Amino acid sequence: MRRENARVVALPLFRTSWMVIALALVAYGAILAGSIIPTMTGAAVSSIATAVLGGALAMYTGMRTRAAPVRLGGRATAARRSYLTLAFAAVGMLYLAVVAGALNTSAGTLWTCQTWPGCEASGSGDWPALAHRGLAGVATILIAALAMQTWRIRHERALRVAVACALGLMLVQNIVGLVQVLLAQAGESLPLAVARLTHLGLSATAWGALVVLVTLALRRPFPSVVAAPSPATVARPGLTDTTLLEGKPSLLKDYVSLTKPGVISLLILTTITSMYITPAGIPEWSLVLWTTIGGWLMASGSHSINCYLDKDIDINMGRTSRRPIPSGRIPAWHALALGVVLGMIAFAILAIFVNMLTALLALAGFFYYVVIYTIWLKRTSKHNIVIGGGAGAFPPLVGWAAVTGSLAPEALLLWLIVFFWTPPHFWALALIREKDYARAGVPMLPVVAGDVETRRQIVLYTLSMLALTALPPLLGMLGWSYLLMASIFGGLFLYYALKLRRDGTTATAWALYKYSLLYLALLFVAMVVDRAVFA
């Protein structure tokens, strides 16, 4: 009888939100406390507390969310099952990673691996530390895949916020884990202890966000193949639950488009090729990989901020009015936040895995493009492309500095080649989009000086560029095979420029614009071929 009375009193108390929140806070504190206890007891405390934290958050989320089951067709049922399988896999993998980290900390094996992301053992027992990293890596991949699926087929704000928090926290805690490795090389210290707590705290918070996501996914209705448009789909014309399940269009694609990946591809090509023509010889693949990742993210960040700053221009231009921000599919501040975050991550990657000079050069290109070109010159001067083109010429400097750790006259020559390539390339497009630029109030050269003067300037800059491309063999930088290839490619460039000067048709402008993209790629590839085959 007494036991029944206790149950009647205790259960209503336990169902209240504040009790569950208190339980979650206690569990979170126990997770952090477990990392301080230098025995296996600490690992047990952290592991159990992590499970309790997940249970408390699941309970609280369930209490605050009304279950709304729906009948689904076979296709939607399969999609829901696949989504939940991925979500549970991510939750389970992250829990194992947290437990493995706690075990390593308690056993004192966390710092046996003195490198990252691989493992260069400094003592015995390195496999537990490497296993922890492997679990964390797999968890990160699963969370990233879950984020892509969530943005693709789920339009509920709560689910998207939860998965975004989980992915963001996971990426940050990975960076903190790297910082721990660097700090551990100097032995135990206060910064290392702080980093250890931060690392575990971020992991536990990411785990909590995933638990909330899974609970919401279980209780919220899954989009059916034939469902009425929701407010989220109404805000995005043409997007229904059917197209969400089919993945067209997707918000993920919109966010990727903010970074202008097509433009970045050519920039990164000049970065990579410049790495293979330095006096230092062929670089290690890992150096090329980290330089590529850092350079790509830095360029992505600058382009995203450019989309934020140019939103008033884009809406007045036919070519850009369908972009995510002017069309209303993405809030403008998202582009700004994305750009800042990508820039910070890129700088950290380049500074840690490449060298500080490379990171600073990439950051200089970032600010050159955002501040000097986008904010200042693009809106105020007919020379916006001439001077602003220097931003696109930074990638060869980044590649050269990544390998040599310094800059040389040869690297500056590569910068000049891209600098003088930019005006003919972009003015060809500006001639085609002249009315758009005039309507948006952008003082591009065709708008200010007219078509005839623009075509004349294209020829002049083309001749200057071709003269610069002939200098590498004369300076002993490259051989005569390069000069032969550069002459052929450059001769065709000059042909299109002169043809545009003569007839001024839109078709010729398009031909020059498209060939200019191919030309720059061929020119830098020719440099590598000359060095690799004929040197």
Swiss-Prot record:
Pathway annotation: Porphyrin-containing compound metabolism; heme O biosynthesis; heme O from protoheme: step 1/1
Origin superkingdom: Bacteria
Region listing for Unknown, in residue ranges: 1-263
Major localization class: membrane
Catalytic activity: heme b + (2E,6E)-farnesyl diphosphate + H2O = Fe(II)-heme o + diphosphate
Membrane topology: Multi-pass membrane protein
EC number, as in UniProt: 2.5.1.141
Keywords tagged on the record: Cell membrane, Heme biosynthesis, Membrane, Transferase, Transmembrane, Transmembrane helix
Cellular component terms per the entry's GO annotation: plasma membrane
GO BP terms in the entry: heme O biosynthetic process
Membrane-spanning ranges: 18-38, 40-60, 83-103, 127-147, 163-183, 197-217, 262-282, 285-305, 334-354, 357-377, 385-405, 412-432, 474-494, 509-529
InterPro entries, per database record: Protohaem_IX_farnesylTrfase, UbiA_prenyltransferase, UbiA_prenylTrfase_CS, UbiA_sf
Renumbered residue ranges of the record's region Protoheme IX prenyltransferase: 264-535
Subcellular location: Cell membrane
GO molecular function: protoheme IX farnesyltransferase activity
Coiled-coil ranges (or none): none
Broadest EC class assigned to this enzyme: transferase
Function: Converts heme B (protoheme IX) to heme O by substitution of the vinyl group on carbon 2 of heme B porphyrin ring with a hydroxyethyl farnesyl side group.
Similarity field: In the C-terminal section; belongs to the UbiA prenyltransferase family. Protoheme IX farnesyltransferase subfamily.
Extra remark beyond the main annotation: Carbon 2 of the heme B porphyrin ring is defined according to the Fischer nomenclature.
Name of the molecule in the record: Protoheme IX farnesyltransferase
Organism name: Roseiflexus castenholzii (strain DSM 13941 / HLO8)
Phylogenetic lineage: Bacteria, Bacillati, Chloroflexota, Chloroflexia, Chloroflexales
